[in-house]
């Protein structure tokens, strides 16, 4: 176990682990709605649906799409302030331009500093790529953990309500996990909601029903009630995460109190062409306004 991941990298309980893993679940649960629309009564068990989802997820090209969007985030990264940022996605990582803090636009001095930071990225793109690689490592770990879902959870209570499939999940007592991320994530219970027509996830939430402890609680404990939720929406034929909420409370390393919370809302999505360079992304994010390249969320529907 790497204790540094608990105290240094968003407590080791990364948003990508809590929200991202289940967003991947939602991206792959297409088979539920498709089967229902064609044959009526659900022909698959919940476990079969989850396994089919995992098999289909790698075939979905949507995760390669790039966007420009507006982000409002309060997290450890923002010093618990609400940051409003314009974000442009590239294959190498996300370029961010800070627009406001706690609802207040940047001063001229702050804006100059922000533009200087972006200029440094253009001057040293390799440094930017190196810094962004940690996030990509997290995503790779999330993909590995995704494959453990059929063993880690019991999925049940599948029902159709007003055109939305709903499914509950809770820990599988026969499963075993290693490391605090797996132990916390796979100790959660919750539910997912899936648009039956579009065959995409709309909402997912999970909550710890009891404490999760490492080293009899002396090394780390995540408290009962810690939770996450995530919402997705169809943006012109492209399904995107529009809200992620994470709230983790606990202690680590001999009773040190730990509290990690994040609240991220994304809007104003605009589809981008493939192959945008880091320099082009910086120019776009500094220019402001929507990106009207080959198409946007209203004009392009693949």
Language model feature labels by segment:
Residues 1-11:
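N-terminal secretory signal peptides that target proteins for export/translocation
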Residues 13, 17, 134-135:
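Intrinsic structural disorder/low-complexity segments
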Residues 28-36:
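Signal peptide processing junction and immediate N-terminal pro/mature segment
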Residues 35-189, 197-202, 207-225, 231-240, ...:
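Structured extracytoplasmic
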Residues 16-27:
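Bacterial N-terminal signal peptides
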């Amino acid at each position: 176990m790497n204790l540094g991941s608990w105290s240094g990298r968003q407590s080791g309980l990364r948003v990508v682990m809590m929200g991202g893993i289940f967003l991947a679940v939602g991206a792959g649960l297409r088979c539920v709605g498709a089967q229902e629309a064609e044959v009526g009564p659900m022909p698959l068990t919940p476990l079969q649906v989850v396994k089919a989802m995992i098999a289909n997820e790698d075939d979905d090209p949507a995760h390669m799409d790039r966007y420009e969007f507006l982000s409002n985030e309060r997290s450890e990264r923002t010093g618990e302030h609400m940051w409003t940022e314009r974000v442009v996605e590239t294959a190498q990582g996300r370029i961010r331009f800070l627009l406001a803090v706690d609802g207040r636009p940047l001063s001229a001095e702050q804006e100059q500093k922000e533009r200087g930071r972006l200029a440094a990225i253009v001057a040293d793109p390799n440094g930017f790529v190196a810094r962004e690689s940690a996030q990509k490592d997290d995503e790779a770990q999330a993909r590995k953990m995704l494959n453990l879902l059929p063993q880690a959870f019991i999925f049940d209570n599948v029902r159709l309500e007003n055109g939305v499939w709903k499914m509950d999940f809770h820990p599988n007592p026969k499963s075993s996990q290693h490391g605090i991320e797996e132990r916390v994530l796979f100790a959660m219970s919750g539910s997912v909601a899936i648009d039956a027509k579009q065959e995409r996830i709309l909402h997912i939430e999970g909550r710890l029903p009891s404490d999760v402890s490492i080293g009899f609680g002396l090394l780390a404990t995540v408290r009962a009630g810690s939770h996450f939720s995530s919402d997705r929406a169809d943006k012109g034929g492209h399904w995107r995460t529009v809200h992620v909420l994470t709230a983790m409370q606990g202690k680590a390393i001999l009773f040190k109190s730990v509290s990690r919370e994040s609240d991220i809302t994304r809007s104003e999505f605009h589809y981008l062409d493939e192959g945008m360079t880091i320099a082009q992304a910086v120019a776009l994010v500094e220019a402001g306004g929507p990106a009207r390249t080959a198409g946007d969320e209203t004009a392009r529907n693949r």
